[in-house]
Amino acid sequence: MKVSAGILCLLLVAATFGTQVLAQPDSVSTPITCCFSVINGKIPFKKLDSYTRITNSQCPQEAVIFKTKADRDVCADPKQKWVQTSIRLLDQKSRTPKP
C-alpha cells in the first residue's frame, strides 16, 4: 500500500511539472523586435556601431536596426543605398583584426 501511494505521488508530481513545461510556447524564449517606421535621413557611418536585420514574418516591414555609438537603436530601410553601404562597411570592420 505504501509503495502504491509513493508511486501515485511521484506520478502526480511528474504530471504537474510535465504540463508546465509543455504549456510554455516557443515564442516566450525569443522576443520579437520590429520596426514600425524607418528613418528618412542618412546616419553618418562614423556614428554607427553595429546592425541587426529584421526579417521576421510577424513584423510589418523588413528593416535594419543600426546601433549607434551613442547606444541608440535606429530603424532604416534595407533598400536604401546608404543602408547597404553601411552594412557592407560594418561587416568589413568586424572582420578586420584589432591590434
From Swiss-Prot:
BP-aspect Gene Ontology terms: antimicrobial humoral immune response mediated by antimicrobial peptide; calcium ion transport; cell-cell signaling; chemokine-mediated signaling pathway; eosinophil chemotaxis; exocytosis; inflammatory response; intracellular calcium ion homeostasis
MF terms in GO: CCR chemokine receptor binding; chemokine activity; heparin binding; phospholipase activator activity; protein kinase activity
Domain of life: Eukaryota
Keywords from the UniProt entry: Chemotaxis, Cytokine, Disulfide bond, Heparin-binding, Inflammatory response, Pyrrolidone carboxylic acid, Secreted, Signal
Subcellular localization, as worded in the UniProt entry: Secreted
Gene that encodes the chain: CCL8
Signal peptide per UniProt: 1-23
Modified residues (Pyrrolidone carboxylic acid): Q24
Family membership noted in the UniProt record: Belongs to the intercrine beta (chemokine CC) family.
Entry keyword annotation includes RNA-binding: no
PANTHER family the record matches: C-C MOTIF CHEMOKINE 8, SMALL INDUCIBLE CYTOKINE A
Record's GO cellular component terms: extracellular space
Subunit structure: Monomer or homodimer; in equilibrium.
Family matches, as Pfam families: IL8
Protein name: C-C motif chemokine 8
Disulphide bridges, residue numbers: C34-C59, C35-C75
CDD domains in the cross-refs: Chemokine_CC
Coiled coil (residue ranges): none
Job of this protein: Chemotactic factor that attracts monocytes. This protein can bind heparin.
